[in-house]
Amino acid sequence: MLMSNLLILPLLLPAVCALGLVFIRTHSRLSRIFSIGTMAVTTVVSLLLLIYVMYHKPIALDFGGWQAPFGIQFVGDSLSLLLVTTSSFVVTLIMAYGFGRTEKRAIRYYLPSFILFLTVGVIGSFLTADLFNIYVMFEVMLLASFVLITLGQSVEQLRAAIIYVVLNILGSWLLLLGVGLLYKLTGTLNFTLVAQRLNEMDDKSSIVIVSMVFLIAFSAKAALVLFMWLPKAYAVLNTELAALFAALMTKVGAYALIRFFTLIFDEHSGITHPLLVFLSCITMLIGAFGVLAYRDIKKIAAYQVILSIGFIILGLGTNTIAGVNGAIFYLANDIVVKTLLFFIIGSLVYITGLRQYKSLYGLAKQEPFFGVAFVVMILAIGGVPPFSGFPGKVFIFKGAIENGNYIGLALMIITSLIAMFSLFRIFFVMYLGNENKGEAIVFNKIPTYRKNLIGVLVAMIIVMGLAAPLLFKVTDNATHLNMDDGLYEKMVNPHLIKGDK
């Protein structure tokens, strides 16, 4: 009972903090300290819950004492708590990164609150175990993210916000339509009972149609092929928000695809999963063309986000234990790596005041620290051992071979090399290029605490790579829980297995 009640804390702590910041919004320093402390505590609580789940069983919290399927239910399993812990960790660093900001009062006053509201939506999406509440949490994210995109009130931000909101609202409508159709088919919203009843149904065509609705809805959220909103939105954000969006927004969509297409729509993998592989291949190609086509380092970073979604969904599409295992590992890894990517890119823009990488020379002497961090980040993105991108890609590689997805496998290898090439191209110009070739650049000094935060992420990437066997115990537990027939139902809601009550 105690552990079940503690499951609400990762959601409750940032929610209460976000509301509390409204009353102390004019005290910028106090607001930052309060929000950073809250997210640090949230990270610790989430990690303790994850450790408990690994040694015991998933935690289920029935709100108001109403047992599933009648009440709202949160479930903390190894998949959700791994992502909650990782997300809370990077949000803590993101809040700390913006500690010394000096923008207009409106931005300083309200930025921390809406970052926390967005975090509430993200964590709620990971923890909720019913269809309608995942829609609600997606809407919380959408509203908070819309405010964050438009907070500076520049023309570029408003233009990017229009594209972002239109596509995400369409995705939300499709998600709500899918929830309604699935409720009509099964008569319930609870994940456990939905999965059980779909497996018992004979009308397979209706299930496939509904699964396609969810696939399109979550693809819009994850930037799986439907990527149009992402590059412009990320390019207009400051470093803090760009890192937040890159780390979390698309990852929630990827999580939803993994959860739904392993647990709920697993019986129709002959149709849905080859389509997932196809979409992942298209997404990898889009990302690869994007990172090669642009010279703006913020847009190159944005297309790196799209490219990584292709890798994750390829693992899911293989419909193998190894592939899904790798997808979950790479998903958690990518939350950390993309935070580091945007921290570094944002810091380089701050130092030089420029975004076109061909104009940047002479950083090797000015900021050698960023050169080291940049190389570690590139190797992690490329999947080079011993860094954190390697283990996940190896298992996705294995899953693709087991399933015979050789085209997807080849594309993953080629686009990984392209991703590394596009970033090494920036590195060679910035750090090894002739500093007398371009115009003279006035370098700004970056605060030491921001370098320290980048150092923490670099260390985290190395630790995740070296601790891969330990992390794979978590991801393997998550994979089997969602893919093994009846295991999720038995572990989370055993009272529903023998019939509805």
Curated annotation (Swiss-Prot):
The keyword Transport applies. The chain crosses the membrane at residues 4-24, 33-53, 79-99, 109-129, 131-151, 162-182, 207-227, 245-265, 274-294, 309-329, 334-354, 369-389, 409-429, 452-472. It is found in: Cell membrane. Keywords: Antiport, Cell membrane, Ion transport, Membrane, Transmembrane, Transmembrane helix, Transport. GO terms for biological process: ATP synthesis coupled electron transport. Pfam families: Proton_antipo_M. It is a multi-pass membrane protein. The keyword RNA-binding does not apply. InterPro entries: CPA3_Na-H_Antiporter_D, NADH_UbQ_OxRdtase, ND/Mrp_TM. Coiled coil: none annotated. GO terms for molecular function: antiporter activity; NADH dehydrogenase (ubiquinone) activity. Signal peptide: none annotated. Belongs to the CPA3 antiporters (TC 2.A.63) subunit D family. NCBIfam families: PRK12663.1. May form a heterooligomeric complex that consists of seven subunits: mnhA2, mnhB2, mnhC2, mnhD2, mnhE2, mnhF2 and mnhG2. This is Putative antiporter subunit mnhD2.
